[in-house]
Each structure stands twice: as C-alpha cells, then as structure tokens.
C-alpha cells in the first residue's frame, strides 16, 4: 500500500527552481544557508535508504482526506494536485498567534508578517503588495472565500478562525475547476472541526503581558451536534504603541433530516482592534536595538470586524447524483490608517455579499467520475479614503497629495461561474483529470465625489495635478475561461509521477479599477491570467516520505505596485521553481523533516520604473531560496520537543533591483507534555538565539530602505485541559 509518513501526509510538498543570483546577491554565507537547507532534506532521503529504521506505524495516505480540490472529502491519493496539509496535531504543537507561524513550514508558502495580525502572502510567487495583490490568492474557510470576489484585502487571513482549525490545506498553483477568480498562485483553506467533536480549553501567557484563551466545546445531542469555538488574545507588542486585541467566535452545527438530507454549517464572528507600528526607516534599521522598538506611526491603527454564515445542504438523488448546495452570507468592515502612504490617509471599506455554491457528482462507473456545478454571488461594497492633516515630505509630494477626501465610491458586483470536471482511472496505473471553468464578474461603480484629480473642493493641485484621480460612474465586465488537465501514473505501489497543465485567472479588484492615480482616467485593465505547467514525483520508501515538484508559470496582464506606490499595468512575469520536501523517522524517537524552495520570479516585458527597465529583473520581495527544517524528539509517548530552523534567503526590496535584504536564519523550540490524559503543558520559545532580523524588507521612494523588524526572543507557556 502506498504510504507516506505523517509529516508528508499532512502536506504534499515541494521546492523551486530558478536561475542563479546576480553577483551582488551571492555572498558566501547565503550559499551556505541554501546548501544546509537542501542538505536537511537530502539527509532524510539518504538516511531512509537504510531499511533498519523503516517503521510500520506511519499513517496511510489513504487515511488523509482533503476538501480543497472538489469541495467534498476525498482521499489524498485520489487528488492530482499540489496540496499541502497542516494537521490538527501540528497546529496544536505550533499553537500560532499568527497564521504565518504555521503556514510557512509548508512548501511554496512564504507569508510576511508585518505588524500585529497583518500579513502579505506568497505562494509560488513573490510576496505581493498593493491594493489588489491579494487577488492572486484564494483565501477560504470551509471552502468559502473569506471575502467577496473583487473585494479582497491583503490581510484577510485574520478573518479566518485558524487558531481552532482541524487542519489547514494549501493548494499551490492555480486551483481546480471548482475554484475560480483569485486562485491564481494558490489557495489557503482553513478547515474547522466537525460539530460535536470534543471539548478542550487552553490558557496561554507570553511576553509583555500577552494573554490568550482558546476553547472548543462540543455538544452531541444525538441527531443534532453543535460546537462552539472561541479564541481571544491581548498583546502589547514589542514595539511602541503596537498592541492588539482580537476575538473570534464560531458556532458549528450538523444534523441529518428524516429524508436523508444532511445539513452542516455555522456562524463566525471576528473582531480586531490593533495599534499598528509602521516601517522603521533607514538601511539595516531593524538591527538597531533602540530603533527597532520604535513606531514612526503611533497614530496608525486597524479595526476589522466580520460576520459569516453558511449552511451546506447535501443529498443524493434517485438518479445517483450527489448534490451539495451551500448558501452563504458575509459582511466585512475595515477601518485603518494607511501608514505606508504619503500623508497617511484613513480608509474605510465595507462589503455585504450573499452567494450560493452548487456542485453535483456522479460515479459513471467504478473508474469514472463526472462533476459539475455553478457559483453565484452578489455584493454591495463601498470605500472612502480621506486625509486629516497636510502631507509632509518633498515639495512635490506635499503639493500633489492633498488634505481632505480622496475617494468615496460604491460598487455593486455580481459573479456567475459554471464549471465541469471529469476524472477517469485505468487499471494500468494511469488516471486523468479534465476540468473547465467559465467565470463572469460585473462591477457597477458609482462615484460620490467630483470626477477627476482635484482636491475635494474642486481646486487643482499644483505641479501637474493631484495624485488621486476619481473616474466617472461606469460599469465593467470580465469573462474568463480556465481549462485544467492533470495526468498521473502510478510507478509502483509506493511511488507516482504527476503532470499538470492549468490556467488561473482573476478579475481586477474594485480598488484597482476605481482608485485611479495621476493621469489615469480609466483603468484599462484586463483580467490577470496565468498558465502553469508542473511535473512532480511523490512516494515513500521505508521510513521516508518525499515529494519533488518543478513548475513553470507565465502570467500576463499583471498589476504591480512600484516604489512610488504607483500601479504598473499590463505586466508580464515569469515564475519557475523547484519544491522539495522530505520526512524521515530516524528511529522510534527522532523524526527529521524539511521543505526547501528554490525559485526565480522575473519581469518579462519592457517597463520603466525609477529610470530602470525592469525587463529581466527579479520581482521585488522574491527570495530565490527559503524553507524550514524540523527535528522532533519524542523520548516518551507523553513528551515531544521540536527544534525548527527557518531559513530565508536574500531578496531585492524594489523592482529596480537596486536594494536588497540579506535574509536570515531563525530557530524555534516547541515542547508539549501530556501531564495526564486530560492536561497538557506546552512551552514554545521563538527566536531562540534572539536574532535581529526583518519580517519584511521594502524600499520606498518616499523614505528609502524600510523594515518590519522581527520579534526578539520570547516564550509562551500554555495549559490545555480536555474534557
């Protein structure tokens, strides 16, 4: 039977391929870091060739189920996709206060933690920033996107209840036909526990007065099952005026009616009140012990609250078709100061949306499965941006970024997307997956201010006009078709090879279409499209499990933000890489696992930014090498300790490739002790060597090198009581 060990069961992993760094990006210790990280994976592979350590207690991959491919549980062995999984056991060990702490151990994933609960995401991509950059990733909970199509937010992962997740699934590369707009570079899906599944309470204390409580309370009333998930945290922050309070609550239910119809769903509420610390400015300022703790933007804040409700209705027709209907509702309100922009304007945005996911499945025979469905969604959204004080800085910036209101608009949007997928399996070891999705998104925009690039009173800014430009009322429609092809061949019971050709797309986000700048009067944007081809090898031998994937992606109509915070349209970028992962049980007590990523992300068309032609340059915030390695020691059945190495390679911090960040290495130590059957004690020590590093490095034309400093050495002590 095809078996993978637990670390690879819980994630289908990989590593990236790319070109060599430029001469200025090839210092000796960076090459050493890359070699050491690759060696961690190679050591597991080489060691596993010794059968003396082979173990029979590794879970079968057939036992692992995922929902991120077809929206219903299916065995991982039946899915031809690059899916990585964080299991409940791993999530409990990590016990993240920010989802980055968990997700970044998966292949292809590189989430930058900015400040507080903020983040910028990378999945087989650069770390993308800008108002619509979030459109490159589909972020979901229970398979339902966290935000409406066209209304994403770069930080929206804090909307998910990941702290109480049963598992987190990550699809690398364009997702299946079941998912459309935003599933360009990948998808993160937070899967919550089944209703009624167990009860426990966790209390945690940490540095600087950090307090966190987490609870899962299950009720099994026979036919009806309920669960209440709760999470709350209060943290002061290690930088000045950078604390936050966050609360999350989710109610889940499940029942089966007399006619056999199954209902499961829930209601989720989140609230975040955050004091935000901005970038520290100046070359290597993150290394300065005093400066790294300061906050240049003490006025900055972020208030976010969301409500989501859904019900999944599943039944089987007499004709043999399985049907799943999932109506849902979401509401999101966000109020924050844009400390990263000149003048630090305040933005208020909100949207209400309702939709329906419809999918049907039919086993045509033992070897063929046909699936089809449709997604429908309607959204009402709005955005206001205003600036309370005059802009400081250069005379040009002060003249062109006015005090007062910049934008005020409403957008109504609709989405409709039919899809079909066909799967066939042959006895000779081959199987094929064919899919197709068509998606149409329409925006109806209403401007509530004066049209054009004037101040809010109609007066003209000197030096060529105001930075912000408001288009007249208009409607925009985008339609896209995305074909999918996957072929897999079982080389033996324990090894298989996979080949995939897919297309991903996203419509421009509302903020990209209607927050115009400078001379733009109409955002002449097309949908972003990416064509992906990948080849993977996956399997196990004895105590080893492994996966290797090479990929090549070509993206057109990309929208990027340059160092002046100006959108550059119609960009062409290329993304190629290698993802490697391995996990090896050295003996009954020790396990070594790791994921290594090597990638090259480049601009592929002529575009002048800062006087430099970007063609051939690395995309900014795109490390060519990064990954993690974990060594777990389990001396007894009740005690487990994990030492984690997080390695980040160097990368350019601007599109012009004139500034860069050296990268870093960070060690984390996590220990979990089952004191009794019901009581567990955990101690997590992060940044074990107190390394001074940057969570994110950036370069801005308004201030030069700037950084979000990484947090210093810190420890969290937790008690968990199961009942």
Name each model feature, range by range.
Residues 136, 175, 187, 191-219, ...:
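Short strand-turn segments of transmembrane beta-barrel domains in outer membranes
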Residues 144-172, 191-192:
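Short acidic/polar hinge/loop motifs at secondary-structure boundaries
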Residues 380-399, 442-467, 475, 488-489, ...:
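Surface-exposed extracellular loop regions of Gram-negative outer-membrane beta-barrel proteins
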Residues 63, 551, 592, 647-654, ...:
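C-terminal beta-signal and adjacent terminal beta-strands/loops
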Residues 207-234, 239-277, 298-322, 364, ...:
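Transmembrane beta-barrel wall of Gram-negative outer-membrane proteins
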Residues 100-144:
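Extracytoplasmic beta-strand/coil segments of soluble accessory domains associated
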Residues 366, 428, 432, 440, ...:
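Gram-negative outer-membrane beta-barrel transporters
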Residues 214, 223-225, 320-338, 490, ...:
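Membrane-embedded beta-barrel scaffold of Gram-negative outer-membrane proteins
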């Amino acid at each position: 039977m095809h078996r993978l060990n637990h670390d690879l069961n819980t994630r289908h992993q990989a590593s990236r391929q790319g070109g060599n760094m430029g001469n200025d990006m090839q210092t000796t210790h960076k090459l050493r870091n890359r070699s050491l990280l690759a060696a961690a994976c190679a050591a597991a592979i080489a060691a596993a060739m010794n059968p003396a350590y082979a173990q029979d207690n590794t879970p079968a991959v057939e036992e692992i189920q995922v929902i991120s491919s077809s929206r219903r549980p299916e065995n991982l062995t039946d899915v031809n996709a690059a899916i990585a999984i964080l299991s409940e056991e791993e999530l409990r060990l990590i016990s993240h206060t920010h989802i980055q702490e968990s997700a970044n151990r998966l292949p292809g994933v590189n989430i930058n933690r900015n400040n507080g609960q903020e983040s910028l995401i990378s999945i087989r991509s650069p770390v993308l920033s800008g108002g619509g950059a979030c459109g490159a990733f589909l972020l979901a909970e229970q398979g339902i996107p966290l935000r409406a199509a066209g209304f994403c937010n770069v930080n929206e992962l804090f909307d998910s209840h990941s702290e109480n997740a049963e598992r987190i699934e990550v699809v690398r590369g364009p997702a299946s036909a079941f998912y459309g707009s935003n599933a360009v570079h990948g998808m993160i899906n937070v899967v919550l526990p089944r209703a009624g599944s167990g009860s426990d309470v966790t209390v945690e204390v940490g540095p600087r007065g950090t307090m966190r409580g987490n609870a899962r309370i299950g009720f099994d009333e026979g036919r009806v099952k309920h669960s209440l998930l709760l999470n709350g945290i209060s943290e002061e922050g290690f930088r000045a005026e950078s604390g936050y309070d966050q609360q999350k609550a989710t109610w889940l239910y499940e029942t089966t009616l007399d006619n056999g119809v199954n209902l499961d769903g829930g209601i989720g509420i989140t609230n975040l009140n955050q004091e935000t610390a901005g970038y520290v400015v100046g070359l290597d300022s993150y290394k300065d012990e005093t400066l790294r703790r300061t906050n240049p933007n003490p006025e900055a804040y972020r208030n976010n609250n969301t409500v989501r409700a859904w019900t999944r209705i599943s039944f089987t027709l007499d004709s043999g078709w399985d049907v799943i209907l999932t109506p849902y509702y979401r509401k999101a309100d966000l109020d924050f100061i844009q400390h990263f922009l000149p003048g630090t304007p305040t933005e208020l945005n909100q949207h209400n949306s309702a939709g329906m996911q419809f999918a049907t499945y039919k086993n045509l025979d033992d070897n063929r499965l046909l699936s089809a469905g449709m997604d429908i969604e309607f959204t009402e959204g709005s955005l206001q941006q205003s600036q309370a004080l005059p802009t400081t800085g250069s005379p040009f910036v002060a003249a062109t970024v006015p005090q007062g209101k910049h934008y005020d608009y409403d957008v109504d949007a609709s989405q409709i997307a039919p899809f079909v997928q066909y799967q066939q399996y042959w006895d000779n070891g081959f199987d094929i997956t064919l899919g197709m999705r068509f998606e149409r998104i329409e925006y109806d925009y209403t401007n509530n201010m004066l049209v054009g690039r004037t101040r809010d009173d109609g007066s003209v800014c000197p030096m060529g006009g105001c930075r912000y430009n408001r288009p007249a009322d208009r409607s925009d429609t985008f339609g896209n078709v995305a074909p999918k092809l996957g072929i897999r061949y079982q080389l033996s019971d324990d090894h298989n090879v996979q080949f995939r050709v897919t297309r991903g797309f996203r419509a421009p986000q509302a903020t990209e279409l209607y927050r115009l700048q400078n001379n733009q009067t109409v955002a002449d944007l097309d949908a972003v499209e990416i064509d992906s081809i990948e080849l993977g090898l996956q399997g196990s031998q004895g105590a080893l499990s492994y996966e290797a994937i090479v990929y090549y992606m070509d993206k057109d109509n990309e929208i990027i933000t340059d160092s002046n915070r100006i959108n550059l349209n119609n960009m062409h970028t290329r993304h190629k890489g290698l993802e490697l992962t391995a996990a090896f049980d050295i003996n009954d007590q020790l396990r070594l696992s790791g994921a290594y990523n090597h990638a090259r992300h480049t601009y592929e068309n002529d575009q002048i930014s800062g006087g430099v032609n970007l063609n051939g340059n690395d995309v900014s915030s795109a490390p060519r090498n990064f990954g993690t390695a974990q060594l777990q020691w389990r001396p007894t059945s009740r005690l487990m300790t994990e030492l984690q190495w997080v390695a980040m390679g160097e990368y350019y911090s601007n599109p012009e490739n004139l500034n860069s960040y050296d990268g870093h290495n960070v060690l984390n130590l996590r220990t979990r002790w089952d004191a009794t059957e019901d009581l567990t004690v955990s101690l997590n020590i992060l940044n074990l060597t107190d390394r001074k590093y940057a969570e994110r490095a950036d370069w801005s034309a308004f201030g030069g090198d700037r950084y979000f400093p990484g947090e210093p050495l810190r420890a969290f002590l937790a008690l968990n009581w199961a009942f």
